[in-house]
Structures are given as C-alpha cells and as structure tokens.
Amino acid sequence: MVAKLIDEDPEQAYAYSKVALRLASRVAAVREAAGFAAYANQKFSEALAEFRAARRMTGNIELWPVMADCERGLGRPEKALDMAGAPEVAKLDKAGQVEMRLVAAGARRDMDQLDAAIVTLQSPELASNSVQPWTARLRYAYADALLAAGREDEAREWFAKAVESDRDGSTDASDRLAELDGVEFVDAFDETEADEAPVAEVGPKASASDEDEPWVEDAEDVEEFYDEDDEEFEPEEKDKG
C-alpha cells in the first residue's frame, strides 16, 4: 500500500507506513518502505534512521545513495560527499553508481561549487548514446548545472538531449528547453469570463501571523522504532543550525 501511494499521496503513504511499523518493526521491507515514505515527505532524520535499520537487517547496499541524499536534506552536504567516496559505492550496480553521482553533484551545488558539480556529472554514462532508466535524469542534472554556471548554450543542448531520452516524462526538460528558446505558454482560461465571474470572499481575512511558515524538521520530533535487536542503533543528533 505504501509503494502504491507514495507518488500520488505521500502523506497518506506515510500514515500507512507508521501503522505498518507498529505491527512489524522487525521486518526489513517495512523499515525500508517507512524510510521512503518519510523521505517523500522530507522527514529526512526519520528516513535516514529507517534506511539504516533496513540496511542493518539485510546488509543491502542499494540504499546508500538515498541515505547520502538524506544527509543533504539535513543540511550536511559534506557528509554526503564523504559517503560518495566510501568503499560501499564500488559495490553498487550501475544504476546505484549513477544515483550516487547525482547526489554528489547535488551536494557540490549545495556548497556553491558549480564547476565541481559539472565535473562530477561528467562520466561515460553521460556521454553514452544508449538510453537507460537513469539517462534523462543524468542529462537533466548536467544541463541544470551548466545553466546555473551561466553556460546557457551548452545547457540548451543538454536539455534537448534530456528531452530525447525522457520517454516517461520524469523531468520537466521540455519546459526548460522551451523557456530557453523564449517560448511563452498562454493560459487557455478565458480572461473575460474571469472578469465577469463574481468573487466570493469566504471567512475573515487572514492576518500576517496566520501565514504559513517554512517547515523545518526537528530531530526531537522523530519517532524511532527499534528494539533490543537493533544493537547498532544510535539516535539522531539534533540538527545544528
């Protein structure tokens, strides 16, 4: 159920994962699913704890890249880079290594190291003409890094390549390419009808204090599920800053 909902309704998937944890916290698949549900809701401390638990139970190295990305989400890009250079990366399959490269490049950008991010993404997988499941995302990330570095012509070229390989629409490369080409999208909504339609005001006007504030995860709010078998469990330190 969590896997089915995680893309369409991350919050509901997270709610289901909490129930599953209460019922079967010693099942590795449950811990992993809970980790992805927390990750989809940007609860990075909780996600990292669940991924670590799942890895302890199975010894599976496939979670290494997403664990590193959790470190990025917690504002620790240096830790993510350390993980990108760890021996575990050599044990990943090709897809995992590409994912790790994407995370490392993102960490470089977090640290305002744009040139280093570009170099990190340069690889045989990027240069290959074959289309793999990761190709569109890799080309997109490279194009986006080039654009951030002010290399617009090269960025346009790679956004176009990303469009060619994005068979399932996993990126918005086509929109980014159109934006670079100066294409303007016009809303099909009839503005004259909008002018004629009465505007109903519901409820009192919200004050400045009622406005939404940015969400910040507090490590103290993270609910951990572990037992005496989780010998390596170490509670997450409270995020600094």
Give a label for each model feature:
Residues 4-5, 37, 68-70, 107, ...:
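Residue-level signature for tetratricopeptide repeat
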Residues 30, 63-64, 117, 172-173:
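TPR alpha-solenoid repeat register
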